[in-house]
Amino acid sequence: MAAELDARAAGARRLVDKVCIVTGGGQGIGRATARRLGQEGGRIVVADRVDASATQTVAELRDHGVEATKVLVDLSTFAGAQDLMAQAREAYGRIDVLVNNVSGTIWIKPFHLYTAEEVELELQRSLMPTLWCCLAVLPIMMEQTSGSIVNVGSQSTRGLYRLPYATSKGGILALTKVMAMEYGRYGIRVNTMAPGGTDIPDRVTPRQFLRPGVMADDGDPAAAEQYRREMADDIRNQQALRRRGLPEEQAAAIAFLASDDASFITGQVINCSGGQS
């Protein structure tokens, strides 16, 4: 947890002794979610591929008395997802909550400017980790006859200049609906939290911003930064609340879906986007 806990969660203890895996827990929404679930009593498994980031999150959690461990893993492969679930189960004996947070736009540009390799990399980063983690955790949750899976979606499915990323997030929406129907009989709930524009001050995953019409080889850092600001302003103007969200606000929605307060909610998408249209 950061220097301060989220005061909005004061007194909430909805996840006491629940074993919660948070993928991509080393930064942004993932780190905020690990903090929130830990603050509510969860035992947290921080999964990330960057050791320094995961270590920082775990240290913050432990500083506030939260039981936490890290697993360094590449979730772009099924073997990596299986290893994560095995380590979590070995450490705690069960898995109650899985938050699939690993993803992130790499390139922002019109679709015709993407190379085939770039498309594959976008899908590998933003779809496959969620798909593999769901597949790997299912046998464990089916055996328990319980579990809550919360996927992190996006408002990009109705936006511009991120078609491969949006395709990944659209796939996650389909995965959520179908899994909820198939595995509800096992007591497993599956939902998605779809954030809008969110300020991520601790982002370590790079993005390549290219003004539409500018080829990738012509990348100009100053122009890219100007384009980033223009895009942020454009997204903000689409939001009813006229501001970008905070990771802690996204984490609050995830904590609700993960908890028994949402015990009769499955197959749903909660848009935590400030009214983004």
Task: Pin down the residues of each PLM region.
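Short, small/polar-rich loop/turn modules that mediate ligand/substrate recognition or access, typified
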Residues: G184, R189, I265-G267
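Conserved mid-core segment of classical short-chain dehydrogenase/reductases
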Residues: Q82, T105-E120, E143, Y161-P164, ...
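Short C-terminal tail/terminal secondary-structure segment
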Residues: A2-A12, I108, I254-A255, T266-S277
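Catalytic Tyr-X3-Lys loop
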Residues: H112-L131, S146, V150, I172, ...
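Amphipathic alpha-helical dimer-interface segment in Rossmann-like NAD(P)H-dependent oxidoreductases
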Residues: A86, R125-E143, A180-M181, R185, ...
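C-terminal substrate-recognition "lid" of short-chain dehydrogenase/reductases
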Residues: R14, Y92, L131, S146, ...
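Active-site helix of classical SDR
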Residues: C134, S168-G171, T176
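Conserved glycine-rich cofactor-binding loop
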Residues: V19, G26-Q27
